[in-house]
From Swiss-Prot:
GO terms for cellular component: cell envelope Sec protein transport complex; cytosol; plasma membrane. The lineage of its organism: Bacteria, Bacillati, Actinomycetota, Actinomycetes, Mycobacteriales. It catalyses: ATP + H2O + cellular proteinSide 1 = ADP + phosphate + cellular proteinSide 2. InterPro entries: Helicase_ATP-bd (IPR014001), Helicase_C-like (IPR001650), P-loop_NTPase (IPR027417), SecA (IPR000185), SecA_Actinobact-type (IPR026389), SecA_CS (IPR020937), SecA_DEAD (IPR011115), SecA_motor_DEAD (IPR014018). GO terms for molecular function: ATP binding; protein-exporting ATPase activity. It holds the Pfam family P-loop_SecA. This is Protein translocase subunit SecA 2. The gene is secA2. It comes from Mycobacterium ulcerans (strain Agy99). Part of the Sec protein translocase complex. Interacts with the SecYEG preprotein conducting channel. Has a central role in coupling the hydrolysis of ATP to the transfer of proteins into and across the cell membrane, serving as an ATP-driven molecular motor driving the stepwise translocation of polypeptide chains across the membrane. The keyword Cell membrane applies. PROSITE patterns: SECA, SECA_MOTOR_DEAD. It is a peripheral membrane protein. ATP binds at residues 122, 140-144, 533.
Length: 806
């Protein structure tokens, strides 16, 4: 973690104290003029509304006005530049007259500190983030610098800013890269990774600007709910969240629960069930025992399969009240593991462990695991020792985590396509930012084939043809298995290709940096979130002109994703900052997005001599399939949000109660009222300070115990709530009713249990106090993310898996 150091001679405290005393260095504001260059096309404004156009025009005018102050900023030495930044009045960003001066200072500080002089479009992007929007900036247009300038604007106004990244690598890289810029404006910078100690984290969060991954921030929030002393709090302050790759964090991973678990003595899932299902699946008559739906996303026992399982388990009735919520659930989970989850598609096996693949990023989800029974079932399927499950002590979804912040803004290359989700679930606007240099990338229409086999043959031929010219090719595949199959095909054609997939993600930055090298062929799984620019001619741009002459980077997509955003992220790798480039997608009527969303009987089948569909409607049909898939994703998000929202509200109540107990004398006062005789007895031998600590530990323990039990109860409900639909009950309504009823007595039960402990705990003989050894907290804790959608694709498709509301 970078230490938080203020600029020499100007302490952080003094800087903020001076901000309300007037602006000694404030320059006169000249009459602003409307910016004429880089105007956005009218179709964006029709989409986003007149209010957005008005706000964007104001920001454009402020960027133009900032040029009037560039010379004054350039004439200031480093010390005066820091002082000028500290004296700006940016507390009310909406009405501040100092915005043009701030932009001039930021531009000058950027050039001095990093060698990067921000373009007008980067300043515009920063202003739209300061207005609370998510901006869409194309790949290579400088989002990192724009984000740092926006963070500086918030911090100079007295706000604490968390720049939220998608992984630790980017958090550290961007913090170290942008720290000189922020420090040049008298701001402190910190960063956090999984290796950061508690002291490192506290120091980083005390900085004006803190860079950290969404996982680490979430885990810090969860761990703070276990401490029994204020001094142990890491205390991330939820003030401003500036989110990089905002669509990935706020949409793709919005529903992912972050989990804090601890050691427990509860039983692990029964291996006999998992082994029984494995035998069932391998049986020569397996087709008689279970059935899958048309798109292989749900599986269930047939009547014959149920009878066979019941017989193997001693003649039980799977659908009886005794077994329907337990044994049947375990059977269904094991079926999903063996029938639907595919190795090298949904997960990989490395170092004797199962690693999930993040579908939206195409990389290993290092901290993710499936809901406990499914994780164990997959491990057993692969012959791997099942990992310790533990007990869930606390959990929070990414969406609930981000909604804690007072202000949320962000940046991504594909915000418009996620605009509806951003508006509906976060009340965020979207501001498209024009490129600094016009995009000249050429995007071909899809090449569509009847079968996947014909498509794959055509892809190899196309890559070979382009490779013969020396033009670099970047191929984006849907999953690991596809990338490795394509790689093998290319090698058989004597085409040397580099593979970047979830199996070698540690090398991804170096691999991607060289994808623009002359004659290079790079095969990669989903490109979202890579965070590394692809420069023509390689990372050193040695052959830039030669590659540009050949047409720049050529991007090949091996199939449409279920959302246009991911297609655009792949296309956006070509045509960086005005460079030439091109893209083409190959699709087939057998692709997932088509099979799940279009009627196969109504698809055109006429082909040319190369097997390519000749109908002009083909690309339009693919677009329609994507729109259907995106609509389903929005419905699923909304439905799942309704389940998670109640838990988030209940958690907020617990957090508020816990903070009261932790930071005040409430625990001592309440137990004194509830057990006055015991309190009087103890107060005669125990100091008030120690007695307060004892009372706090007792009350916190029972509150935490009650919350963990409540979460376990909710998990049990989720495993069988879908069965309520069979009785014509609304599962959501039933879940809410049961969750509310259970929560109603949680606080009172915790207080009652605390009173009993206070009155019955033995008095210590060797020192004043109570023996609290029975209030045993977990001997170890760990954090992870739950992949609550095991067949994760970009639609979050409906599943029958118990415990998943889809």
């Amino acid at each position: 973690m970078r230490s938080c150091t203020a600029a020499p001679g100007v302490s952080r405290t003094n800087t903020h104290a001076r901000r309300g005393l007037g602006v000694a260095y404030r320059w006169a504001v000249s009459k602003t003029t409307r910016a004429q260059s880089g105007r956005l096309s009218s179709r964006f404004w029709r989409l986003l509304g007149a209010t957005t156009e008005k706000n964007q025009n104001r920001s454009l005018a402020q960027v133009t006005a900032s040029a009037e102050f560039d010379k004054e900023a350039a004439d200031l030495n480093d010390e005066k530049l820091r002082k000028a930044a500290g004296l700006l009045n940016l507390e009310d960003l909406a009405d501040s007259a100092d915005i043009p001066q701030f932009l001039a200072i930021a531009r000058e500080a950027g050039e001095r500190a990093t060698g990067l002089r921000p373009f007008d479009v980067q300043l515009l992007g920063a202003l739209r983030m300061l207005a609370g929007d998510v901006i869409e900036m194309a790949t290579g247009e400088g989002k990192t610098l724009a984000g740092a300038i926006a963070a500086a604007g918030y911090a100079l106004g007295g706000r604490h800013v968390h720049v939220v990244t998608i992984n630790d690598y980017l958090a550290r890289r961007d913090a170290e890269w942008m720290a000189p810029l922020l420090e040049a404006m008298d701001l402190t910078v910190g960063w956090i990774t999984a290796e950061s100690t508690g002291a490192d984290r506290r120091a980083a969060y005390e900085c004006d600007v803190t860079y950290a991954s969404v996982n680490e921030i979430g885990f810090d929030v969860l761990r703070d709910q276990l401490v029994t002393d204020v001094a142990d709090l890491v205390s991330p302050n939820p003030d401003v969240a500036l989110i990089d790759e905002a669509d990935s964090v706020l949409v793709d991973e919005a529903l992912v629960p972050l989990v804090l678990a601890g050691t427990t003595h509860r039983e692990t899932p029964r291996l006999e069930i998992i082994k029984l299902v494995a035998q069932l699946v391998k049986d020569k008559d397996a087709d008689e025992y279970f059935a899958t739906d048309a798109d292989s996303r749900n599986v269930h026992l047939t009547e014959a399969g149920a009878r066979k399982v019941e017989k193997a388990l001693g003649g039980i009735d799977l659908y009886s009240e005794e077994h329907v919520g337990t044994t049947l659930t375990e059977v269904n989970v094991a079926l999903h593991a063996h029938v639907l989850l595919q190795r090298d598609v949904h997960y990989i096996v490395r170092d004797d462990a199962v690693h999930l693949i993040n579908a939206s990023r195409g990389r290993i989800a290092q901290l993710q695991r499936w809901p406990d029974g499914l994780q164990a079932a997959v491990e057993a399927k692969e012959g791997i020792e099942t990992t310790e499950t533990g007990e869930v002590l606390d959990t929070i979804t990414v969406q609930a985590l981000i909604n804690r912040y007072v202000t949320v803004c962000g940046m991504t290359g594909t915000a418009l396509a996620a605009g509806e989700q951003l508006r509906q679930f976060y009340k965020l606007g979207v501001s498209p930012i024009p490129p600094n240099t016009p995009n000249i990338r050429e995007d071909e229409s899809d090449r569509v084939y009847i079968t996947a086999a014909a498509k794959n043959d055509a892809i190899v031929e196309h890559i070979a043809e382009v490779h013969d010219t020396g033009q670099p090719v970047l191929v984006g595949t849907r999953d690991v298995a596809e990338s490795e199959d394509l790689h093998e095909r290319l090698l058989r054609r004597d085409i040397p290709a580099v593979v970047l997939n979830a199996k070698n993600d540690a090398e991804e930055a170096a691999v991607i940096a060289e994808a623009g090298t002359l004659s290079r062929v790079t095969v990669s799984t989903q490109m979202a979130g890579r965070g590394t620019d692809i420069r023509l001619g390689g990372s050193d741009e040695a052959d830039h002109d030669q590659v540009a002459e050949l047409g720049g980077l050529h991007v090949v997509g091996t199939g449409r994703h279920h959302t246009q955003r991911l297609d655009n992220q792949l296309r956006g790798r070509a045509g960086r900052q005005g460079d030439p480039g091109s893209s083409v997608f190959f699709s087939s009527w057998e692709d997932d997005v088509v099979a799940a969303n279009l009627d196969g009987n109504k698809l055109p089948m006429e082909t040319d001599e190369d097997g390519q569909i000749v109908s002009a409607k083909a690309a339009g049909l693919l677009d329609h399939a994507q729109r259907v898939a995106e609509g389903r994703m929005l419905d699923v998000h909304a439905n799942t949000w309704r389940y998670n929202q109640l838990i988030a509200q209940q958690r907020a109540i617990i957090v508020d109660r816990r903070n009261t107990l932790l930071r005040t004398a409430t625990a001592r006062e309440e137990l004194a009222d509830l057990a006055p005789k015991r309190y009087k007895e103890l107060s005669e031998t125990v100091s008030e300070h120690r007695l307060e600590k004892i009372c706090r530990m007792i009350m916190l323990y029972h509150l935490d115990r009650g919350w963990a039990d409540h979460l376990a109860y909710l998990a049990d409900i989720r495993e069988s709530i879908h069965l309520r639909a069979l009785g014509r009950q609304n599962p959501l309504d039933e879940f809410h009713r049961m969750a509310v009823d259970a929560f109603a007595s949680l606080a009172a039960d915790a207080i009652e249990a605390a009173q009993q402990t206070f009155e019955t705990a033995n008095v210590l003989e060797d020192e004043p106090g109570l023996d609290l050894s029975k209030l045993a907290r977990p001997t170890s804790t760990w954090t992870y993310m739950v992949n609550d959608n095991p067949l994760s694709d970009d639609t979050l498709s409906t599943l029958s898996l118990p415990g998943v509301f889809r």
